[in-house]
Amino acid sequence: MFCEKAMELIRELHRAPEGQLPAFNEDGLRQVLEEMKALYEQNQSDVNEAKSGGRSDLIPTIKFRHCSLLRNRRCTVAYLYDRLLRIRALRWEYGSVLPNALRFHMAAEEMEWFNNYKRSLATYMRSLGGDEGLDITQDMKPPKSLYIEVRCLKDYGEFEVDDGTSVLLKKNSQHFLPRWKCEQLIRQGVLEHILS
């Protein structure tokens, strides 16, 4: 059936939970592109035959194939665009270093796009706020307090706070730290916020 593979790509994204990135379906995308190539070649052949032979009975078939081509293109672009939006959101959620599990689900071109986006965002943040720049990825929601209590979920090592003091983050240790310094580690799964 026409457009079935393209619709399966869309269903695959729809089934993935929000904030999750399913594995890049290179095989499915290749099948859609092969179907589009076959439809285009059939249409070219029928258009040439309709022009030279005066066969107007081929026009509905040509239009149907053309509509299938357009639908396949829309689905393919929607699949790729939705993946880019999810990858962009991952940069804001996890920071500049993605976990291996997420990188494994990305195509090489998507990793390249992520790295370019990461560089562009870093350049923009350095251009704000004078010499030090401004990290706009922090405090996505306004904090209720400046310091929070956190528990370390795995051994991390030394962690330096702005005033120059160092804290040793060992598994199951608890600390009272500035919220904005902890948010990145919380997203990475190193720390968890202890709610009283």
Curated annotation (Swiss-Prot):
GO terms for biological process: DNA strand elongation involved in mitotic DNA replication; inner cell mass cell proliferation. Gene3D superfamilies: 1.20.58.1030. Keywords: Chromosome, Disease variant, DNA replication, Nucleus. It is found in: Nucleus; Chromosome. GO terms for cellular component: CMG complex; cytoplasm; GINS complex; nucleoplasm; nucleus. Induction: Significantly up-regulated in aggressive melanomas. Belongs to the GINS1/PSF1 family. The keyword Nucleotide-binding does not apply. InterPro entries: GINS_A, GINS_bundle-like_dom_sf, GINS_Psf1, PSF1_C. This is DNA replication complex GINS protein PSF1. Component of the GINS complex which is a heterotetramer of GINS1, GINS2, GINS3 and GINS4. Forms a stable subcomplex with GINS4. GINS complex interacts with DNA primase in vitro. Component of the CMG helicase complex, a hexameric ring of related MCM2-7 subunits stabilized by CDC45 and the tetrameric GINS complex. Pfam families: PSF1_C, Sld5. It is linked to Immunodeficiency 55: An autosomal recessive primary immunodeficiency characterized by chronic neutropenia, natural killer cell deficiency, recurrent viral and bacterial infections, and intrauterine growth retardation. Postnatal growth retardation is present in most patients. Its main location: nucleus. Required for correct functioning of the GINS complex, a complex that plays an essential role in the initiation of DNA replication, and progression of DNA replication forks. GINS complex is a core component of CDC45-MCM-GINS (CMG) helicase, the molecular machine that unwinds template DNA during replication, and around which the replisome is built.
